[in-house]
Amino acid sequence: MHPLTVTIITLNEAAHIADAIDSASFADDILVVDSGSTDGTVDIARGKGVRVLTREWTGYVDQKNYAAEQASHDWIFSLDADERIPSALRDEIRATLADDPPFHGYRVPRVSFHLGRWIRTTDFYPDYQTRLYHRRFARWRGRYVHESVTVDGPSGQLKNDLQHYSFSDLRDQIQRINHYSTLAARQMYESGRRTGPVEIAIHPPAAFLRNYILRKGFLDGTAGLTISLMNAWSVGLKFMKLWELQRSPKSQIPNSKSQ
């Protein structure tokens, strides 16, 4: 069996890190890369007996690539602190690495717990993520948002879900939407994208219809309706912030440490 390192990058994840580490306990090596936590995250991780490195925050992609470089083994599973590897996925990972895997990277479906339930509708699911990969043939890429692993050659796909505790409540979701819509607008602006009233008017209702009707958000009741409305608002906010950047490019440039 090929040995595995699970990498976790952290910043003030005291509420999550212990459970994340416990879910990865089957791995041969667990590495936490912390970027200056002040809430006891590092002490909790070290108390679990895992390796902990500290490094100044330089962005999601750079931190995750650094973690992979510092791993003890070539096969990596990149786990966020608010995610859990349940037993079914654990067994599938071990079975995949038991022989010589035919692919250098594997996507996993991710299911999110929000508003009191596991959401298997809307754009929340299956939310495929490439998390299991061989570091010699794959690398994290991206700018401000939508970071992902780029694999040399085709990728495989696992069947069992990675669990994601996405938001603590609606207030948390609103705060994150505000933050990530700023980064998304900045990324679009720097890539040359521009917008106007037509896009701002059309994209939010289109996003709502896609999530609530086409992606069957209605099957999740009020939770599905709320998620669909939040998604529409997020899309609208992103385009409105892009429009604001066009008018005043310095108005929405967050400090790099806030990313």
Regions found by a protein language model. Give the residues of each.
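A conserved acidic beta->alpha catalytic loop
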Residues: S23, D34-D43, D80
